[in-house]
Amino acid sequence: MTVTTEGRTIEGRPIGARPVPRLKQRYRDEIAPALREQFSYRNVMQIPGVVKVVVNMGVGDAARDAKLIDGAVRDLAAITGQKPAVRRAKKSIAQFKLREGMPIGAKVTLRGDRMWEFLDRLVTIALPRIRDFRGLSPKQFDGAGNYTFGVTEQSIFHEIDIDRIDRVRGMDITVVTTATTDDEGRALLRALGFPFREN
């Protein structure tokens, strides 16, 4: 560990600067150069990267019980470290007893360091805690290198206190990348540690 007060740095960082997330550093040092070599990119701007992660929790039952949305917002805030936006119904649907403006879900969009820290926790801690987990499907890309998958319960995240769960809630997680093809997106996410099944 290098500590100097003259140059005002600690371990090569300016004093007061936040440490670079572990996965972001790995992407810069190892993953990006490996992808450049694998796909023979001429320009560094062609190397695919992660733009944002969107975590969405639908609460259809909130139409009948408004308190349920509070639990979803609390869980999502604990998992992501960011205050979720409450999503409301855009139109009324009588069959679902849904009126326009009713809260039906919560959503968080993560960018920057929070995004990298969330992805790191997701692949190293949360996904391995899923019961009978055999890997993620490699086919759920959208054709443009973005990946969406579902998680059936929030308890896989260690930020959630199992004793305080009022009900099991699933969520959809979308990883938006700058990749132009599914193969590029798959290679990027696999390098980041996403455990894809071998089909």
UniProtKB/Swiss-Prot annotation:
GO molecular function, one term: tRNA binding
tRNA-binding listed as a keyword: yes
Superkingdom of the source species: Bacteria
Pfam families registered for this protein in UniProt: Ribosomal_L5, Ribosomal_L5_C
Record bears the keyword Acetylation: no
GO cellular component, one term: ribonucleoprotein complex
Signal peptide: none
BP term (GO), one: translation
SUPFAM superfamilies: RL5-like
InterPro entries: Ribosomal_uL5 (IPR002132), Ribosomal_uL5_bac-type (IPR020930), Ribosomal_uL5_C (IPR031309), Ribosomal_uL5_dom_sf (IPR022803), Ribosomal_uL5_N (IPR031310)
Assembly notes: Part of the 50S ribosomal subunit; part of the 5S rRNA/L5/L18/L25 subcomplex. Contacts the 5S rRNA and the P site tRNA. Forms a bridge to the 30S subunit in the 70S ribosome.
Functional note: This is one of the proteins that bind and probably mediate the attachment of the 5S RNA into the large ribosomal subunit, where it forms part of the central protuberance. In the 70S ribosome it contacts protein S13 of the 30S subunit (bridge B1b), connecting the 2 subunits; this bridge is implicated in subunit movement. Contacts the P site tRNA; the 5S rRNA and some of its associated proteins might help stabilize positioning of ribosome-bound tRNAs.
Family: Belongs to the universal ribosomal protein uL5 family.
Identification of the protein by name: Large ribosomal subunit protein uL5
Organism: Frankia casuarinae (strain DSM 45818 / CECT 9043 / HFP020203 / CcI3)
